[in-house]
């Protein structure tokens, strides 16, 4: 990665998870904005500002996939990492086969997220 600070947006309806991700990522030099409310995140979204958006897939008001689509309609130049609490292998297979190829994104990570796994994914996506 270059010396320019990468900016990340985190959207997770569980405030503790959003805060934890923010703390971890900031510790490694990223600039992070975190929102627990998807609509607030959308209202505060500025095209061209974020290198990566980390989205919870399952949120009460709007799914991470729907929110991703709304962000993409405003700015096509960011990358995305989806968070999921899905535990069943069949659910993962469905995501990989049916959802991600249509969206052009295949990056996802299972909750609870370890610091190591999070950083590996983020560095891999941004490099």
Regions found by a protein language model. Give the residues of each.
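Active-site residues of response regulator receiver
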Residues: 12, 56, 84
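Two-component/phosphorelay signaling modules centered on CheY-like receiver
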Residues: 15-33, 103
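Non-catalytic signal-transmission and effector/linker regions of two-component phosphorelay proteins
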Residues: 1-7, 114-127
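Short amphipathic alpha-helix used as the core "switch/output" element in two-component signaling
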Residues: 65-78, 97
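Acidic catalytic/metal-coordinating carboxylates
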Residues: 36-37, 63-67
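Receiver (REC) domain active-site loop signature in two-component systems and cognate sites
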Residues: 59
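Acidic, metal-coordinating helix/loop segments flanking the phosphotransfer/catalytic sites
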Residues: 34-52
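Alpha4 helix (beta4-alpha4-beta5 surface) of REC/receiver domains from two-component response regulators
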Residues: 66, 87-109, 116, 120
